[in-house]
Amino acid sequence: MLLWLYHSLIMSDQNTASFYIRNIPIFGRFILAPMDGYTDSPMRKVCKNFGSSLSISEFLNGIDVTRGHPHFKTQSYFDESERPFIYQIYDDQPARFLAAALKLAEHQPDIIDINLGCSAKNVSNRGAGAGLLRNPAKIAEIAGSLVQNLPIPVTAKIRLGWDEQTENYLDIAHLLEDCGISLITVHARTRKQAFTGQARWSAITEVKQAVRIPVIGNGDVVSYADGIRMLDETGCDGVMIGRAAIGNPWIFSGSDRKDIDNGELLAVITSQLNLMVDLYGPGIAVPVFRKHLVRYLQGLLNTSEIRRNIFSIANPHNLLQEISELIDQRQPQ
């Protein structure tokens, strides 16, 4: 009953904003989380078609943005259909962080997001991402500088703290709000937990009750029903879905992937692969798409022979033919 009621409320009036990021209306409460190596423009477009209300770049290294990087063009690419669009940046140096944000602002995104949540050791151990949670003064310097110098809203994504002994999420939330940040996303785990253990949704509730700006919840949402439950239990303004959306854009619309018919499954796979070919060229698109394909074809790549055959195909057209034949064997449940 609760799932049906929330879905009806969410879908009833597409002309009414669910919440605002400063002056930007957001239509919908389910959002694709930024994931390094996954949430490129093709994946964002596919998920937006199914209901993701915001498009967020893969996290961008401030060093790469300011100095240049061979993959920067494709990593930073977005088009008008993805709006509202956010660039997410990580860095440990305030001056370079601002320089990167100003450079990215030239591409006319709608919002810039400060990554204070990445738990990867190569990021957090250098003091960037979740590593910044150990240095509130530097967070204030970065957030204040971006808010003062950018003409667009600035948001931030945080974790609960570096570890269970140094949780400071409420202090960081207040600090960010005081700096003029327009929205906070809370991944309800510590940096030490990374993606292990259970996300503590009660912390999302605490942040929502502590600040006046919108709060997005993140962590352990693996189904549409989980997202509805997070909204209900925490009072957050929106729900961010990450790993559960890989190969499953239907999670944003409330449909169960196992109920999707074969024709629609093939059409969505084809759409994402074609978008990737347009962005990267076939030589890069096909191998990069394989990690998505494994999730789309969950339960169908049952033998090493099937996997070897699928993963040996380099031509996009031939790959889609093989995928079509494989999907024909699938029985929607």
Predicted regions: what is each one?
Residues R83-I152, R159-T166:
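Active-site beta->alpha loop and helix N-cap motifs at the rims of alpha/beta catalytic domains
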Residues S57, I111-S119, C179-A188, M240-A245:
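Non-cysteine beta-strand/loop elements that form the S-adenosyl-L-methionine
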Residues L32, C47, E58, Y87, ...:
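Conserved, mostly hydrophobic/aromatic
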Residues V65-F72, K121-S145, K192-T205:
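Active-site-adjacent beta->alpha loops and helix N-cap segments on the catalytic face
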Residues S12-Y20, M35-D110:
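Glycine-rich, positively charged N-terminal anion/phosphate-binding segment
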Residues L9-R22, I26, D36, S41-P42, ...:
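Alpha/beta catalytic cores of nucleotide-metabolism and tRNA/nucleoside-modifying enzymes
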Residues M35-G37, L60-G62, Y90-D92, G117-S119, ...:
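Active-site beta-loop-alpha junctions enriched in small/polar residues
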